A protein has these predicted regions:
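Feature marking well-ordered beta-strand scaffolds used for ligand recognition
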Residues: 27-1024
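Residue-level signal for mature regions of secreted extracellular proteins and peptides
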Residues: 19-20, 669
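C-terminal motif of bacterial Sec signal peptides marking the signal peptidase cleavage site
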Residues: 22-25
Length: 1024
């Protein structure tokens, strides 16, 4: 649901994440010949932009929401009763070893360790718990999963990790890393262990970390000549004795799932049974159970006996399906699984299978009890006393298969007789059940309910059940919370459902969206209980998608990726937020300014739907590894922020909500009082001189009727954004131009009448930073055309529109030959209060830049048809007397990315694919080329190309001085830096692993690049 956002700043950003961001719709196959080009030509025809047709209005769709990528998916591990404290150290032969849970947090004395999905490992001083202070941070590349802390050393498990193995080969999977935090300001790496696949679950026994990982058969590169690999599951042991992380052993098995249950001496592993490695997902619904001996305190793994059972134990559900498998008594395994592989209907049958592992080398099935009508993913929980005093299973079917009564049955099974488990009691629960949490003779059931069958009224629900008599379970009470749509991370892991029986409190984090209040509804729910009743609950509203609520002394700490909040729960019915510390801001731009850096953040997805922030920090604190309190900040009205810099003045453009009259169908968003709302843009001047941050003047653009759910500045990640260009352009330092392309027509006596004021180019004059002024003009009123691609050349603003020469046949739009003529519109801003269109000139494509010596020598990118092949070129033409005379054409084969012009040189990346013929007529694996096109002699351009057929994928991200930065890999997991020179092709210099998955902006000061990476913050990259 999250949209990765790429803001345009002073450096053009490539449309990342699509195979063809510049030229055409992916997979298009032009079949029409283009008009020949020759020197001196001044009339041009081109192919229309991708997706345009007769009557098409152009422009990217308007999106509601903001920039960030993603909620935290971290669901680590930890104690289910209170904040876990750091263990004293590894086990020994004389001390019985205990199984410990990992988690995304750890409390050790006056230190809080928190594994933040965006900012990595964060260390806080909580000696003054009401005012926690960040005292150290270790950024992490990849997706932090969970950790354990021993004697100040954190062992962190990271998934989605790209890099190279010790032998230099490409590696994608998971790692376990040791981080010595004894000096939080100088965290050190104490070793790494490479773990195949994606780690699904972990446990600690003594001083050994055990992991289970699933590998779907990753392939590297383009896979030419490669075979398809079957999925595998691996268990590994990693020693952290003495604070040093080393891999001890690893065992790999065919299959998927990887559900494992850990005791002090054994791992019981469940994987999907594969009968045909060539079709691993088409086999029977069977599961392989294996007994793995881990009795060696050093971490040696020994596989003992195993067998195959006739059901599929699913890895879906909370904690990687952990609750579908039990081995608590170290002798009998209990497994609940479906007899069809995907359990896709309410008619599928489950099996409750009991396996006798009294002899670990020769297990045997003791019983298999069929259970009908459980749906796709049943909620199960085994509650077995290792000493044998009781053995139960709590079971509820998937809520999607329970009919329309709003009730879900709770069934209790007695497992005390391995050969004859039986159903002993039932009762009804409300809604759908996600997770069961046993609490002695009581049981918590976590789920959600629906109101009137609408998903936007889905509340989190906690029900409390007396199971002291399993034959007659009785519901003791329930509480609902999270108005609107709500969810809890406890649906994914029991570690988020914190119970402190001594306090009679259960703490459940939740997050959601309330459409009535048009706001996020996040925080902690405090549920009060006694052995006989659920007596009440209270809500502490905090920021961010809350992952945990943990007890620390007399306070609760609310942990989200965005914020750490301190909650006073002395009155559990009315908990009070004492303080809140921001942990991760969605940084959209960072402008270095000598000794300081100005960071703009806009956090709509992070739960601030009305405000952005400009912060000025010491340049040495750009990465924010500590919080030393030396930064200054100022709030800015609106969200979806972008900034245009003019010295120490920042022109911040945001989307703001404005009350409007309600139309017959409403305007979409409504305030709590029923007032209709619409969006528009606001420009706020921020003065960051002398290390400060002060608001100057502001101005708001007119509201558009189609702006209810949308904003501007969202482009940059669609393949067709190359021709739209930016919707906001800075001209001459102190002016901004805005493209409004949401045309509307009013009824007229002779047909629709174009309403100019609703579709215009707006000019904001910022020459007086305390009193900005607005003016506008209409670029075109043609009902069938398009305009856009605003571009500033010095103090001159240009826009582009096109005219159809041959339009698609509406009855066969894909089989029609059609062409357009592009026209360059020069916008006269001599009088900014009265802008007007000067001359309109036919040109060969869309404007990408101009000569630094002669502003009438213009550079264009064009797309045209040449039989079955796509053709792209960079054309140079001389603007003279109402015409643009062609000087040269340089053809570029393949898909072309963004074109960046600097000092009479055009830079772009071109992707070649295997369906494109090379000069020798043979097919090769896809590869990219980085072009440096020297246009200083417009009649004789020189194209210098850097390429490596083995490199594969990459797009030009930006050009900063004598460096070009190219994305590396399918996801933006790294960048390649190329050194630029006047008389040679770009030369590869270094690769840098990047934080996060996208870049909002790239800036440079001296020998350091600053990559603005959203919630991952600012990443300084020191150039070699």
């Amino acid at each position: 649901m999250f949209i990765q956002r790429f803001l345009r700043s002073g450096l053009a950003l490539g449309a990342l994440g699509c195979a063809c961001p510049f030229v055409a719709a992916c997979g298009s196959s032009p079949t029409v010949g283009g008009t020949p080009r020759h020197t001196g030509q001044s009339v041009y025809e081109s192919a229309p932009m991708p997706g345009t047709s007769a009557g098409a209005r152009g422009g990217a769709p308007v999106n509601a929401g903001a920039a960030g990528a993603g909620s935290s998916g971290s669901s680590g591990a930890g104690s289910a009763s209170a904040a876990p404290s750091a263990p004293a150290g590894g086990g020994s032969q004389s001390t019985p070893r205990q199984v410990q849970e990992t988690d995304i947090y750890r409390v050790d004395g006056n230190r809080l360790y928190y594994l933040n999905s965006y900012r990595g490992l964060m260390v806080f001083d909580i000696s003054d718990v009401d005012h926690p202070a960040l005292i150290g941070r270790s950024p992490i590349f990849g997706d932090p999963q969970e950790m354990i802390v021993t004697n100040g050393v954190a062992v962190v498990v990271v998934g989605d990790w790209y890099g190279t193995a010790p032998d230099g080969s490409p590696f994608y999977g998971s790692i376990a890393r040791g981080l010595d935090c004894t000096d939080p300001g100088n965290i050190k790496n104490t070793g790494e262990a490479y773990l195949g696949g994606w780690v699904q679950d972990t446990r600690v026994v003594g001083s050994v970390l055990y992991t289970v990982a699933e590998n779907d058969g990753w392939q590297y590169g383009w896979g030419y000549g490669a075979t398809n690999y079957s999925p595998t599951v691996s268990i590994a042991s990693v020693s952290f004795a003495g604070g040093l992380v080393t891999k001890v052993g690893e065992k790999t098995f065919a299959g998927t799932g990887g559900v494992f249950n850990v005791t002090p001496n054994a791992i019981l592993l469940a994987t999907q049974h594969i009968t045909n490695p060539s079709a691993p997902y088409d086999g029977p619904a069977q599961t392989d159970l294996r007994y793995v001996d881990i009795s060696d305190p050093g971490g040696t793994i020994t596989v003992r006996g195993g067998l195959t059972i006739d059901s599929w134990v699913s890895g879906w559900g909370p904690d990687n399906g952990r609750w579908n498998l039990d081995f608590a008594d170290n002798a009998h395994a209990h497994a609940i699984g479906c007899t069809s592989q995907y359990c896709g209907s309410d008619g599928d049958t489950y099996l409750l299978t009991t396996v006798d592992f009294a002899n670990p080398d020769a297990p045997a099935v003791a019983s298999a009890l069929p259970i009908a009508n459980l749906g796709w993913s049943a909620a199960a929980r085994f509650d077995v006393d290792p000493s044998g005093s009781y053995a139960h299973m709590y079971l509820s079917p998937s809520g999607y298969y329970t009919g329309n009564t709003g009730q879900t049955p709770l069934s209790i099974y007695d497992l005390s007789k391995p050969s004859a488990p039986q159903l002993v009691g039932q009762t009804g629960l409300d809604g759908q059940i996600w997770l069961f949490m046993p609490q002695g003779q009581q049981l918590f059931a976590l789920g959600n309910t629906y109101s009137n069958g609408t998903y936007d009224q889905s509340l989190v629900d906690v029900q409390y059940v007396d199971v002291s008599n399993p034959t007659a379970p009785k519901r003791l009470g329930a509480t609902e919370f999270g108005s609107g749509w709500a969810w809890s991370p406890a649906a994914d892991t029991f570690k988020a459902f914190i119970i402190d029986a001594t306090k009679g409190l259960a703490v459940i984090p939740f997050s959601g969206w309330d459409s009535n209040s048009q706001g996020y509804n996040n925080g902690l729910e405090l549920v009060q209980f006694t052995p006989t009743a659920l007596v009440g609950s209270g809500t502490a509203h905090t920021k961010g998608w809350v992952q945990r609520g943990i007890f620390v002394g007399t306070r609760l700490l609310s942990l989200s990726d965005q914020a750490l909040a301190v909650v006073d729960y002395s009155n559990p019915a009315l908990p009070n937020v004492v303080s809140e510390l921001t942990l991760a801001r969605n940084v959209v731009n960072a402008q270095p300014q000598g000794a300081t850096i100005a960071e703009l953040s806009s956090d709509w997805w992070g739960n601030d739907t009305s405000t952005s922030e400009m912060r000025v920090l010491p340049i040495g604190d750009a990465a924010e590894t500590t919080d030393n309190g030396r930064g200054v900040s100022v709030p800015i009205r609106g969200v979806d922020a972008q900034v245009f810099q003019n010295g120490t003045l920042g022109y911040v453009v945001t989307d703001v909500q404005i009350p409007v009259p309600c139309g017959p169908n409403g305007y979409g968003p409504r305030a709590p009082n029923g007032q209709c709302l619409a969006y528009t843009q606001e420009i706020q001047v921020v003065d960051t001189s002398n290390g400060g941050a002060a608001l100057r003047g502001s101005v708001t653009l007119p509201i558009l009727p189609y702006s209810s759910y949308g904003g501007w500045g969202w482009e940059g990640f669609y393949y067709y954004d190359w021709y739209n260009g930016a919707d906001v352009v800075q001209v001459g330092g102190d002016a901004l131009a805005f493209r409004r392309w949401y045309p509307q027509y009013a009824p007229g006596p002779n047909g629709p009448v174009y309403e100019d004021d609703l579709d215009a180019l707006y000019v904001v004059d910022l020459s007086n930073p305390d009193a900005p002024a607005i003016a506008s003009l209409t670029v075109t009123d043609d009902l069938t055309t398009w305009w856009g691609n605003m571009k500033a050349i010095g103090n001159t603003l240009y826009a582009t529109d096109f005219r159809w020469m041959s339009q698609p046949d509406p009855n066969a739009p894909y089989g029609t030959l059609y062409t357009v003529r592009y026209y360059l519109d020069q916008i006269d801003l001599t009088d900014r209060a009265h802008p007007r269109i000067g001359q309109r000139v036919n040109v060969p494509g869309v404007l990408v830049g101009a000569s630094s010596e002669d502003a009438t020598m213009l550079y264009f990118a064009d797309y045209w048809y040449d039989g079955p092949n796509e053709r792209n070129d960079i054309s140079v033409c001389k603007l003279d007397g109402g015409a643009c005379y062609l000087q040269s054409v340089t053809e570029l084969d393949g898909y072309v990315g963004s074109v960046i012009v600097q000092n009479d040189r055009a830079y772009t990346t071109v992707q070649e694919y295997d369906w494109m013929l090379n000069n020798n007529g043979t097919y090769t694996p896809p590869y990219f080329e980085l072009h440096q096109l020297d246009l200083s002699n417009p009649q004789a351009p020189v194209d210098r190309i850097a390429t490596d057929p083995n490199k594969g994928w990459g797009w030009l991200l930006g050009v900063a001085g004598d460096r070009a930065v190219v994305t590396s890999g399918w996801g933006q997991v790294a960048v390649d830096v190329y050194r630029l020179s006047a008389n040679a092709a770009p030369s590869y210099e270094q690769s840098v692993r990047t934080l996060g998955w996208y870049a909002n902006a790239l800036t440079r000061q001296d020998n350091t690049l600053y990559l603005s990476s959203g919630y991952w913050g600012v990443q300084p990259i020191v150039l070699q």
